[in-house]
């Protein structure tokens, strides 16, 4: 197992015509390998979940992409379409490669990654894993990053508050700049600057705290100062100030929410 993506909205090479999750296998030996009879699974308690039905020769130092499309196994059998999908929202999600004699060849637990990013070995066949902001399905792994910076967090949970609150943003990481927005947009270096955390973990604030008087969506990101790391995931909280309600409330924040509301597409926001 050399690389995978469970957030693919860019590479469409599957038979079902959708942007499917994908798994890249790499033959690090000097001999060709026929994958017929091998198994792939996403669950450690069901190692034989999907089996390669046909002959598929993987040449030495070559790659092959398997799409985790979740196709109904009763439909036409495909050599590169598994019966399961990958999910970043489950804690027990793996990719497991098993030989025809039921020996586990390789496995990796899924790590969370951003849209169109991938997780892969730092270079083809390496023992360590990295993040790739530019995935390379069926290509050599290059341009890796160690990981994402830690996601910022707030001192108040999202929810309803009767009075104004003073919001603080922190991050359990070093060498990051924290930016935030109050309009629901994804923060970047052009957004509101909150502060810097230096290499010793000391935070230098541009302002003492955010005083929230009205209902607002706050989103924050940690921008990496290190080339070896990628920017963090975005943390989003909605604060309802002095708002009465009698029904359950759901708050959505994203730049493509309209597409979801009107059924144009299924896509991360």
Predicted regions and their residues:
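Activation on beta-sandwich/Ig-like modules and their edge loops
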Residues: 1-129
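Short, compositionally stereotyped local motifs that mark structural "simplifiers"
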Residues: 4, 57-60, 66, 113-269
